[in-house]
Amino acid sequence: MKKTNKNYYTDEVNNILIDLGYNPCQNKEEMDDILKENNIKIKIFKTEEVLPNSAKIPNSYMYFATCGEDDFSEDFTEYITFCEAYNAAILESLSYLWLTKNRKNG
């Protein structure tokens, strides 16, 4: 994931925001408003909190995200930083939203 110099969100996240008709986000408050508007909920956990007896990478993160009634959970990828997990969760949720909207329109 390539992080922009301007803000917290990756280029991939900002590109999909543009495709969805939003401006790229400059801060967490803007993103929170977009997530709330689209009924997206994201939770980030330390891997060892979710899978305490696993051989997972220590101090890594996992995400759980929902978009409406659809649930996304990342069981196989471990993100080394909170920021990586957060961007991955947002990207997956917004990608799903984009696919849903384009399926209805196309």
Give the location of each predicted region.
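N-terminal segment of the canonical double-stranded RNA-binding domain
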Residues: K2-C83, L91, L99-R103
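Catalytic phosphate/metal-binding cores of nucleic-acid and nucleotide-processing enzymes, i.e., regions
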Residues: Y86
